[in-house]
Amino acid sequence: VKLDEKFTETDRFSSFVRPKFTNKLNKYVKNLTHINEEDLKKASDFVTVLSEFEKFSSGDDTVFLSWSDTDMHVLSENCRQFLSADSADFICKYADLQRYAMKFLKTETKNQVSLSNAAEQFGISNEGLSLHRACDDSRLCAEILQKTYDKRQFAGYIRVLDRKYYRRLMFKPYYVTSQDDPDFDISDFSQNCPHCKKPLSATGKIKHFKNVFTQKYLCKHCNKRYKIHLKIKKTYDGAVKNIRLNELK
């Protein structure tokens, strides 16, 4: 859906995309979206639909929104596949509405909130809408934006879609599995006994299992045994280390 500066809906765009590499939808997708194979057979290919969407949506000050950046990730993957480009070049500004709206939701968890649950918390009815279909999901997003819009706060969530944005978007985090990795540091295992505060002594070799490095230790002062667990996750911004010390009984 397209909104003007007063958040009034001015136009809608809706189109299926005909898949190139498969002719069948799995049962889960059918049940979730209520889309069937016949809908897709009549559709145009990705490049054609993207061109039509560009004509519908382009503008110098257009800000594109979606509920989480998953749609941007999928769009970028398809642009790489069919256009040999990281992105659709007419999409220059983008905001993740889910991240923005979470500021206004009363929730005790940091987990992502679904669009339908967010709409319910904002008192927005989804009656008569077909959820998980792009056009109706966009209508819910528009209503959530209307309910929460604050010019200053929202501006902080608008991203310019440059190369750095797409490098971050497409980066796949992974766990370090080798001691030869530059982010593996043996000194991370240097811990003190929680009871007497004396340095622990290693009693075995470092082992690795299911993305976790472990090593057993002994406190020679109070004769307590421990195991240290180290997990290293590589993210776009660098390595994140999680170190846990367990006392062995």
Residue ranges and their predicted role:
Residues 82-83, 112:
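Short, hinge-like loop/turn segments at secondary-structure boundaries
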